[in-house]
């Protein structure tokens, strides 16, 4: 029996939230922005979920880690 052809769904790429809002500098003191990239358990969300570039993901991770060190963000929320 011949296989059915696989249909690819053409989806528009989701926009980068940082570029869309014009954010160029990611600061560890901006906890409202950083919380958007954390899960409800306090973990940093992946690039695939947040749609940021690799460089922005590295800057976000560094800012979140600095904010945790300064006790602005929790390490985890249980």
UniProtKB/Swiss-Prot annotation:
Residues making up the signal peptide according to the UniProt record: none
Ranges where the record places region Disordered: 1-22
GO CC annotations, alphabetized: cytosolic small ribosomal subunit
InterPro entries in alphabetical order: Ribosomal_bS18, Ribosomal_bS18_CS, Ribosomal_bS18_sf
Recorded superkingdom: Bacteria
Membrane-traversing stretches: none
Biological process according to GO: translation
Keyword DNA-binding: no
Keyword Ribosomal protein: yes
GO function terms (MF aspect): small ribosomal subunit rRNA binding; structural constituent of ribosome
Gene3D superfamilies in the cross-refs: Ribosomal protein S18 (4.10.640.10)
Keywords in alphabetical order: Ribonucleoprotein, Ribosomal protein, RNA-binding, rRNA-binding
Job description of the protein: Binds as a heterodimer with protein bS6 to the central domain of the 16S rRNA, where it helps stabilize the platform of the 30S subunit.
Assembly, per entry: Part of the 30S ribosomal subunit. Forms a tight heterodimer with protein bS6.
Record-stated family: Belongs to the bacterial ribosomal protein bS18 family.
NCBIfam families listed in its UniProt record: S18
Protein's UniProt name: Small ribosomal subunit protein bS18B
Origin species: Streptomyces avermitilis (strain ATCC 31267 / DSM 46492 / JCM 5070 / NBRC 14893 / NCIMB 12804 / NRRL 8165 / MA-4680)
